């Protein structure tokens, strides 16, 4: 278990449909129930002693506006995900009513692939904050070199920034593509409430593992949990699914910090108590 210090602000996570539509208090109360445990890894990811240099782009650029200085430190590329690490130094006049969260827009090769935006703030001192963001995407381009346009356009969910902090970054996903393991599946399972799902694939990188699945109709009950088990008896539970389209028919379920390096595993749909809901699926690395 990794314990986080008391100066870490709460974590919030927004999907594309929710951004800017809900009041701050409602958003925090509702979303924290869903994502605090998983998004807390944003801090842990940079704090742990693991070599992610091959997937990281050092930036070190600073932009200024009336709110203060924002320095984009690093960008990490993952499967359908971009992770950002920035430092915020507020201006003396900047006195927020709430804790500070920034939700950047990230365009990839000029297009917006974002489906979910998570953030975490850590107060390093009274005048310095570390800002972490996880931007989840769908149908990410396969180019080895990507042009990222990163725009910090609003803070605390719905407050627009008059002069956004903007950064242009060239990032490589060449090594990520080499180290990524794909487990093609294309099998149907019955999940909670007898919802029929097509499990498309599992994708694993040194940073995270994601189960991709879809249904013919919009998924009503989102309590879609899975377990992946190794031959040696290890087991990991995936319990935070998120939609990949506005129709609610395409989904992903990601577990950060898990890298599936063996050739064979078993995937099992389970309920909240961990009980199996349908037959286990044997998955094999492509």
Predicted feature residues:
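N-terminal Sec-pathway targeting helices
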Residues: 17-32
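Alpha-helical, hydrophobic structural elements that either
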Residues: 8-13, 25-26, 37-286
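N-terminal targeting leaders characterized by basic, low-complexity, disordered sequences
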Residues: 1-8
């Amino acid at each position: 278990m990794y314990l986080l210090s008391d100066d870490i602000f709460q974590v919030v996570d927004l999907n594309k449909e929710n951004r800017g539509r809900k009041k701050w208090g409602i958003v925090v109360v509702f979303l924290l129930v869903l994502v605090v445990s998983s998004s807390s890894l944003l801090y842990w990811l940079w704090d742990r002693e693991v070599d992610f240099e091959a997937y990281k782009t050092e930036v070190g650029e600073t932009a200024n506006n009336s709110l203060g200085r924002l320095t984009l430190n690093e960008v990490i590329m993952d499967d359908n995900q971009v992770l950002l690490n920035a430092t915020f130094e507020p201006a003396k006049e900047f006195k927020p009513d709430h804790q500070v969260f920034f939700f950047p827009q990230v365009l990839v090769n000029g297009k917006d692939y974002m489906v979910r935006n998570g953030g975490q703030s850590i107060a390093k001192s009274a005048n310095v904050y570390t800002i972490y963001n996880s931007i989840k995407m769908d149908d990410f381009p396969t180019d080895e070199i990507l042009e990222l346009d990163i725009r910090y356009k609003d803070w605390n969910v719905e407050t627009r920034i008059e002069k956004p902090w903007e950064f242009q970054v060239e990032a490589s996903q060449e090594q990520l593509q080499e180290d990524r393991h794909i487990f093609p599946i294309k099998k149907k399972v019955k999940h909670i409430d007898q919802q029929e799902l097509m499990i498309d694939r599992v994708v694993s990188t040194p940073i995270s593992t994601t189960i991709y699945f879809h249904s013919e109709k919009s998924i009503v009950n989102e309590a879609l949990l899975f377990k992946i088990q190794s031959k040696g008896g290890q087991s990991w539970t995936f319990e935070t699914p998120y939609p990949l389209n506005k129709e609610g028919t395409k989904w992903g379920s990601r577990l950060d910090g898990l890298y599936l390096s063996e050739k064979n595993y078993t995937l099992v749909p389970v309920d909240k108590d961990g009980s199996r809901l349908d037959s286990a699926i044997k998955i094999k690395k492509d």
